[in-house]
């Protein structure tokens, strides 16, 4: 996938193209259906297929208090877009200057000017330009002026009628329903970050953990224990992951993401790792004794092994 992180980076003769425009947070099954349609339209007309997206949610600038947490970082989003087989992605920096560009100027500068757009695929509720002044009707009018066609794509809905959306995925993750979220995302939801030194309590209890730093990427699911895969240098390890503030111990006010890799005891401090969530195991509980916590951690390991299909490590015979 060709990646352009500014209009100036787009080669002069890159077009003509078919495009779709949006945040694409999560790159979920609804997004993928749109991108599949984009590829079809582009192939039928001999055009390149291009996604136009933003480096952040525009609401983070326009209405920060109402802006939801992103499901993915910009880097994660681009990686997932690359798996959709589109020809290119143009990432626009959504700053104050871009927010004040009129709908007409956005079309003439970005769509017609930089990309030489011939087809635009959008949803029925698509808005663009300063203060969201542009809608599908205006886009069609501008298409007649600049020589592109507008194709409106229907939303993708589940069997029960719920629209597939980033908001829905965020709701599922907020409830710990990572397996259901994965179905909509067409991949395991993941977070990534650098492993930092924690309080070493897990190691003292016989369950050393990799603690992610505060600046981890990706939406953190609900507090609880999860079966997951810990990815280190491209290698996946079965893991029990704890999210929360360790209620059994005092003095842990901040939410932590900790991964215990089964049957592993390695030094990965300072490494950038990824956690792929598979299934929710249980909620966080405050135990009255350390022994009770250790007993539960043993049960958690059994549950995680069963979920991930990882047999217990055999104890060498004496």
How should each PLM-predicted stretch be described?
Residues 135, 140-245, 318:
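Glycine-rich, Lys/Arg-enriched anion-binding loops that position phosphate/diphosphate groups
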Residues 11-73:
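N-terminal catalytic cores of NTP/NDP-binding nucleotidyl/phosphoryl-transfer enzymes
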Residues 54, 94, 155:
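Cofactor-binding loop segments of dinucleotide-utilizing enzymes, especially the Rossmann-like FAD-
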Residues 2-9, 69, 90:
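Short acidic-hydrophobic, aromatic-tinged amphipathic segments that line or gate anion-handling sites
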Residues 28, 81, 120, 181, ...:
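Residue-level signal for inorganic ion chemistry
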Residues 198-318:
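Phosphate/ribose-recognition catalytic cores of enzymes acting on nucleotide-derived substrates
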Residues 60-146:
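N-terminal Rossmann-like or analogous alpha/beta NTP/dinucleotide-binding catalytic cores
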Residues 2, 87-90, 149-151, 274:
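Conserved beta-strand segments of alpha/beta enzyme cores
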């Amino acid at each position: 996938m060709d990646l352009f992180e500014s209009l100036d980076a787009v080669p002069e003769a890159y077009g003509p193209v078919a495009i779709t425009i949006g945040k694409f947070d999560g790159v979920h099954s609804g997004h993928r259906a749109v991108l599949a349609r984009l590829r079809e339209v582009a192939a039928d007309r001999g055009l390149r297929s291009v996604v136009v997206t933003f480096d952040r949610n525009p609401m983070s600038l326009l209405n920060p208090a109402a802006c939801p947490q992103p499901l993915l970082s910009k880097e994660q989003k681009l990686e997932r877009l690359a798996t959709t087989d589109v020809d290119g992605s143009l990432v626009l920096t959504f700053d104050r200057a871009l927010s004040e560009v009129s709908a007409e100027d956005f079309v003439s500068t970005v769509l017609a000017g930089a990309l030489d757009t011939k087809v635009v695929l959008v949803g029925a509720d698509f808005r663009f330009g300063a203060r969201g002044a542009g809608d599908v009707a205006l886009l069609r009018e501008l298409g007649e002026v600049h020589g592109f066609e507008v194709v409106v794509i229907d939303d993708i809905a589940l069997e029960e009628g719920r629209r597939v959306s980033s908001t829905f995925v965020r709701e599922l993750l907020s409830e710990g329903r990572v397996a259901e979220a994965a179905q909509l995302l067409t991949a395991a939801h993941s977070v990534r970050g650098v492993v930092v030194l924690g309080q070493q309590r897990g190691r003292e209890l016989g369950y050393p953990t990799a603690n992610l730093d505060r600046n981890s990427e990706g939406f953190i699911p609900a507090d609880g224990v999860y079966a997951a895969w810990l990815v280190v240098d491209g290698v996946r390890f079965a893991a029990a992951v704890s999210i929360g503030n360790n209620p059994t111990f005092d003095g842990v006010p901040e939410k932590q993401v900790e991964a215990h890799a089964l049957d592993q005891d390695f030094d990965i401090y300072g490494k950038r790792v990824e956690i792929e969530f598979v299934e929710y195991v249980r909620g966080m509980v405050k135990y009255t004794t350390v022994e009770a916590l250790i007993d539960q951690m043993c049960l958690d390991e059994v549950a995680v092994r069963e979920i991930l299909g990882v047999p217990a490590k055999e104890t060498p015979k004496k």
